[in-house]
């Protein structure tokens, strides 16, 4: 347990940041899963719509450094390829 006032405050701040960042990471994963689900279902219009929303979410979370920018870019690239593959198959 933290003994000094400064250490107690830092512990409170760390817990608050961890809670907030966990929620954002969850939002990141949920956005990716939603696009994947639409692609697997073969719903081209919904996949494109969800992809656009997912890109916005992914970029926001990468800007806040919740996930690394390279991981964000890789996720967007893979989702784009999946959506494009769905359009090519149609």
UniProtKB/Swiss-Prot annotation:
Keyword Ribosomal protein recorded: yes
The protein's name: Small ribosomal subunit protein bS20
Keyword Ribonucleoprotein found: yes
Function field: Binds directly to 16S ribosomal RNA.
Organism ancestry: Bacteria, Pseudomonadati, Pseudomonadota, Betaproteobacteria, Burkholderiales
GO annotation terms (biological process): translation
GO molecular function: small ribosomal subunit rRNA binding; structural constituent of ribosome
Organism, scientific name: Burkholderia multivorans (strain ATCC 17616 / 249)
Residue ranges of the region described as Disordered: 1-25
Coiled coil start-end: none
Segment forming the signal sequence: none
Similarity remark: Belongs to the bacterial ribosomal protein bS20 family.
NCBIfam families hit by this protein: S20 (TIGR00029)
Superkingdom assignment: Bacteria
Gene: rpsT
A GO CC annotation given for this chain: cytosol
Keywords: Ribonucleoprotein, Ribosomal protein, RNA-binding, rRNA-binding
């Amino acid at each position: 347990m933290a003994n000094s006032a400064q250490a107690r405050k830092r512990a409170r701040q760390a817990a608050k940041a961890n809670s907030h960042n966990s929620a954002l990471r969850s939002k990141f994963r949920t956005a990716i899963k939603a696009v994947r689900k639409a692609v697997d279902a073969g719903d081209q219009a919904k996949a494109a719509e969800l992809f656009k929303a997912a890109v916005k979410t992914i970029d926001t979370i990468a800007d806040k450094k919740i996930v690394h920018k390279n991981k964000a870019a890789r996720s967007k690239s893979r989702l784009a390829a999946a959506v494009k593959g769905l359009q090519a198959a149609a």
